[in-house]
Every structure is written in structure tokens, then in C-alpha cells.
Amino acid sequence: MSSGNIWKQLLEENSEQLDQSTTETYVVCCENEDSLNQFLQQCWQIDEGEKVTNLEPLGFFTKVVSRDEENLRLNVYYAKSPLDAQTLQFLGVFLRQMETSQIRWIFLLDWLLDDKRLWLRQLRNSWAALEEAQVAPFPGGAVVVVLNPSHVTQLERNTMVWNSRRLDLVHQTLRAACLNTGSALVTLDPNTAREDVMHICALLAGLPTSRPVAMLSLQSLFIPHGADSIGKICTIAPEFPVATVFDNDFVSSTFEAAIAPELTPGPRVPSDHPWLTEPTNPPSEATAWHFDLQGRLATLYRHLGDSNKAISVTQHRFHKPRSEDYAYEFELPSKHPTIRDLIRSAAADSPNDVADSIDGLMDGIVQRNVH
């Protein structure tokens, strides 16, 4: 066979790959390999041997999938979040021949990871890097995917940090960030129905979808570009500063200050696992925040026992519990009225005596477990 025929045969065999009309290009930004593999497996059903083992500095794989009885080649680049100038420079080597409108950007956030207080900063820094490199996605060209939202229930039940007001803050902040950048916002859980996953895949590709918009629950979001608005976001809290969520003041003094740092990130845990694993490294003062329930109860009972020994005193009253009694290690934000009255322990504002504080604390625990 002549060399000309060999090249002709090679071109024919790979003509599908060369046809740009049957190719879609994605850039996936994430913090963790396990998060990326979960996303790739659910959306594009990668095989075990195709799983990602390293995010740095840049990764790539290609896969042929079927959509509407047509074979489609996916070219997927992945990079560690947040994006920076160097990563975009590496990407530019591969994507410089493509129009910006041909590239779909995906930003993964994961409730199972201990970086939730940094979500907003990561999104802001990634977007700033894209704009500086003049490759920012066009409106509708990016999607923020929040993985494992069912873990929110575990956080509510097992921690003193994640109450409804903090969750509302995350809810409004993510929607505002996506509205301001022209991005879509969806949640993806391991138990998400396959039909819903297909709608998410269509949204990732920028295709129309018949799935109804869902924006009321933080655990079930499906908000295509153009479906949200400032008015809809502000139905949760009317004074929420939608337009300024990327400002330094809001990022550091409101969002990050309101969400307490968690223990040093350890291994990922499944959604049915207790909230925290044992940390691989001891937490520092800057990264640890906890509420020692057993220790607090022991202290209250000890004070109550001491007071009962003073028989000569007719009535025993104790000081009003202060915030430092509860070992808070961060200052609640106060710059925005909407955020100003984030949770304090109910006992910290109670005018009752210590015995009532114990009863109130135990009632709260029972109510949380019932719900």
C-alpha cells in the first residue's frame, strides 16, 4: 500500500475526531480529584481506568458518547481551582485555535470537602483570572455544579455551625455569584436520577432542556442562565447585596467570617458517614472551630451542684452566659443587616438561670434530632 493510501485511510478512520461539529470542549475546575471523578462518572460515565489521579498542572482526556443517536466526542481539560494566569497560559496552548464560544467552563464545589468558606473566593479569583486573560465565558457559557448537596442534612444535624441562616447565606451567595457572571447553577448528588443527570448534561453543553427551574432549596438547584434575577434572590433576605458579593469586604468580612473554619481537611467521607473524620493533622487555632457539648454540659452541672451546696442562700442566680462561654473563635459579621443577627447559642441570650439553660440546650438537641 502506498504512503498516500495509508494517510487517506488514517484520515478516514479519524474523520470524526477532526469534524469540529461533533466535538465539544470543556474545562472543569475543581479542588479535589474525587470530586472530579464523581462528576465525570455521573455525567459521562467514565470507566475505572479513566479516573483522574492528579490535577496539577493540567489534565486532559477524550471520550466518545452518544446523544440523540449521534456520536459526540468530548474533549475535557481539567485544572485545580482557583484558576490562575499560569494555568490559563497552559490551557491557551491547546485552546488558542478555538473561539471562546466553543469552550464550556465548569466549576465544581463539593459539600463533602472542608473548603466551603472559600467557595466564593475561589469563584471570584477564577473569574478574575479569566477576565484578565480575556477568555471569560460568554453569558451561559459556564456552569457551577455543587456536588453532594444531601450532605447538608448531615451538617445541620451533627454540627452547631450550619443553621438555616448560614445555609441561606450560602444559597443567596452562590446564586448571586452565578447571576453576576452569567453562569448556570445546578446541584448533583450520587442519588440524582439518570433522567435529571441527562438534563444537567444538556445544560453543560448549552442545549435547551425541558426540566423545570428549581431555585427554592439549596439541596436541589437547577437554574439555567437567564432564569434567576436580583428580585428572586432577595426573596430569601430582601437586603442581600447581590451586586457586590465579589467585593473584598463581602468575601472576607461577611461570607468567610460567617462560615466557621472546619478541621484540617481529611479524607472524603460518604454522605451517610458521621460529619467529621479524625483529622490527619492537629488543627491550628486559625483553622479549628468546635462546640464541646459534653464539656459545656459538665460545666453547667458542676456550677449547679456547687450552688445546691450553699443551703443558707434562699435563691441562687448566676451570671448571664456570655459568648466566650461557648468558645466561639471568630467574630460574627455586622456590616450587612441581613447577616448581622446570624446564630448565637440560645443560651447566650437567655435571661434564665443555669438550670433553664441546660433544659433549653437539651430541648434544642431533641428537636434537631426529631427533624
Swiss-Prot record:
A Pfam family per the record: DLIC
InterPro entries associated with the record: Dynein_light_int_chain
SS bonds (residue pairs): none
Top-level taxon in the UniProt lineage: Eukaryota
UniProt keyword Disulfide bond present: no
Localization per record: Cytoplasm, Cytoskeleton
GO cellular component: cytoplasm; dynein complex; microtubule
Keywords recorded for this protein, A-Z: Cytoplasm, Cytoskeleton, Dynein, Microtubule, Motor protein
Record flagged with keyword Protease: no
Family membership noted in the UniProt record: Belongs to the dynein light intermediate chain DYN3 family.
Role of this protein: Component of the cytoplasmic dynein which acts as a motor for the intracellular retrograde motility of vesicles and organelles along microtubules. May play an important role in the proper orientation of the mitotic spindle into the budding daughter cell yeast. Probably required for normal progression of the cell cycle.
Subunit structure: The cytoplasmic dynein is composed of at least two heavy chains and a number of intermediate and light chains.
Name used for this protein in its record: Cytoplasmic dynein intermediate light chain DYN3
